Amino acid sequence: MKYIYVCGPTVYNKVHIGNMKPIMTFDLFLRGANFIEKQYLFLHNLTDIDDKIIEKASKENKTELEISELYSDFYLKMLDEYNINKPDYIEKVTDNINMIIEYIGLLVKKGSGYIKKGSVYFDTTKYPEYGSISNLNLNKTLDGDDDFKNEKNNPHDFVLWKKTKVGITWKSPWSEGRPGWHTECSALINHIFKKDQIDIHGGGIDLIFPHNENENIQNIALHGLSLAKKWLHVGHIKWENEKMSKSLNNFILADDFIEKYGNDTFRTLILNTSFSTPISINEEILESNKKISNKYQVTFNQANLLIMQSKKRQNEVETQKYLEKIAKLLENFEFSKINFEINLQIKLFNSVVDLDAANKLVECFKLLGFKFSSQNVSQKDLDLFLKWKIEKTNKNFKISDKLFLELKEKKLV
């Protein structure tokens, strides 16, 4: 068994497609890994307490819990809509406060944390490994805890427990307050996996510093090891070369994307790019990926129609070899090569109506997690298709044209 953790969103608003990219990327990776029997235990978090949530609750005259539950539910709904397999654990910070307090207590007991005016800070000066994840010039880089700069012993020290009476708070041995963001993730990993080191830590590229750096150093303090064997960072989605973000108001909400382009278009988009490099999108690129997604769905349905009609036995050994090849590409994040392989099979299928190619395509689309692949072609669909072919052969074009439109609506042609 291997262990993977992927940082989740801060649930203060509806997620946009930039928020969905990391979880979609690792969904594809895990589908490949699981197929070749490399089993991962997958932990994903939801940051459901944060200054942004408190601010939103105040503006809308709601509680922090009402805001976080609303947008947590929305995010979980989007996982389903985008056909993303649910992680083994989805943990909310607010469900784990006592555990996080205990974790901070361990760091204080170890001498890695110090207390100032009721807040607890991590002492980065004790660990020369600090900076090893980001490789940044720490003399020029601060972590952004400006509210605490007059309390910290060192500019790079970060808050483990924040003393405050603003928003939702909890009692701790040090003060009334709430945990720091950087300690929430490392505490969850330590608690759920109970391992000194996990195999993969994933998330957006913007989390390298300070978040991943600060997660990592806490694990080094407690266990003497880097938190993860591999740190994998997913590139941003940009709108016409500008980072997509709520603050810039240049984002596409996850549900709006589905309404305009379809859920499988997003999976197609991710498969057409490198996982670690930024994607710059615009209307033309999204429409192009929508066409590719539609082509894949039509191909899937036509391949199923052929399989339903055929009495020939399928070559299951060759199909299995093909799927193992695709799975290994997924596991290695070589997504663009998968599109090349799919298009080769589509070309073969279309040129000679090849049954083996049809079977490979059907199973491949299922492996890749396209939502359309969960919908089977029915006998009624096959009857409609065969009727269209008969009418077309008999040159009853008025009838065949009408049937063609029905088939097209069902994405069978």
Curated annotation (Swiss-Prot):
Superkingdom, taxonomy of origin: Bacteria
Textual note on the cofactor: Binds 1 zinc ion per subunit.
Motif segment ('KMSKS' region): 243-247
Principal location class: cytoplasm
Record organism: Mycoplasma mobile (strain ATCC 43663 / 163K / NCTC 11711)
Gene: cysS
Keyword field contains Hydrolase: no
Cofactor: Zn(2+)
InterPro entries in alphabetical order: Cys-tRNA-ligase, Cys-tRNA/MSH_ligase, Rossmann-like_a/b/a_fold, tRNA-synt_1_cat_dom
Reactions accelerated catalytically: tRNA(Cys) + L-cysteine + ATP = L-cysteinyl-tRNA(Cys) + AMP + diphosphate
Coiled coil: none
Annotated positions binding Zn(2+): 7, 185, 211, 215
Record text on subunit structure and interactions: Monomer.
GO cellular component, one term: cytosol
Keyword annotations from UniProtKB, A to Z: Aminoacyl-tRNA synthetase, ATP-binding, Cytoplasm, Ligase, Metal-binding, Nucleotide-binding, Protein biosynthesis, Zinc
Name the UniProt record assigns to this protein: Cysteine--tRNA ligase
EC number assigned by the record: 6.1.1.16
Binding site for ATP: 246
Short motif ('HIGH' region): ranges: 9-19
Intracellular or extracellular location(s): Cytoplasm
The organism's taxonomic lineage, starting at the top: Bacteria, Bacillati, Mycoplasmatota, Mycoplasmoidales, Metamycoplasmataceae
Residues in the signal sequence: none
PANTHER family with a match to the protein in the record: CYSTEINE--TRNA LIGASE, CYTOPLASMIC (PTHR10890:SF3), CYSTEINYL-TRNA SYNTHETASE (PTHR10890)
